[in-house]
Amino acid sequence: MQDGRIKIYKKPKPAHKMKFTFPEGTTAVMGHTRLTTQGNQKFNFNNHPFYGKADKEFAFAHNGVLYNDKALRKEKHLPKTHIETDSYVAVQLIEKQGKLNFESLKNMAEDVQGNFTFTILDQYNTLCFVKGSSPMFLIYFEQLGLFAYASTESIMSKAMKKSGLNGYRYSRILLSEGDILSIDRNGKTELSAFETFSFQNDFRYPDGYDSHEELLLEMCGCFGVPEDDIIQLLDYGYTADDIEEMLMDSEMLEETISDIKEMNEYEDLWEYGEKIH
């Protein structure tokens, strides 16, 4: 926020290389590290957060993948855009309604199909969460009057250690799929809901994978990585966060997969040796 207007700073580079300072008087900040699935990240307009404007300005970020963005553009007669990502259709659905409120967020969430958790920050420093099947970890530091969120608990834990927040007590705010939560600049919270789309729950991978792991299995093809490789990593105890980092570092991913395959080959040879003896 600067002079009552939303200001978005983003670059097509790793988050740890980003350097910026907060404007004086800042009370709310949202950030996003993109795992690219659609739209070249080298073109900065494809990166999150996105700028939107309805009855107020807002910044919008999405964790997940939408499957019906092209169909919605035709069905809802949305304007043409140079932005290539599936996520941006959600911004356009809000803008088309002309308002940013619980009703417009509900309508948008019920129109899109896929995996998502959306975060929206408006020009009055109200932050909204629209919780779909994608993971989210939200906490509140009462002593500091501070809300903080990340996609997973492990990512939050790392951020807290680096920022020094791990020295403070906090409580977790649990949101279920279908919840919409708003937090205004004074910390007042309001809760609403939307109807979840049954397609999100029609298909499940075997062996009880959670929603974050299923999302990685669905997205891995965008990186040219076979599902079998992701399943092997999960079977060997790598977490969804570990695998997400590997997808953004192809050398690390290839090396890890190669090591696992070598171990499997060694185990097969050992079992064969046992049998012939």
PLM segments and residue spans:
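Conserved short alpha-helical segments that host acidic/polar catalytic motifs at enzyme active sites
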Residues: 1-277
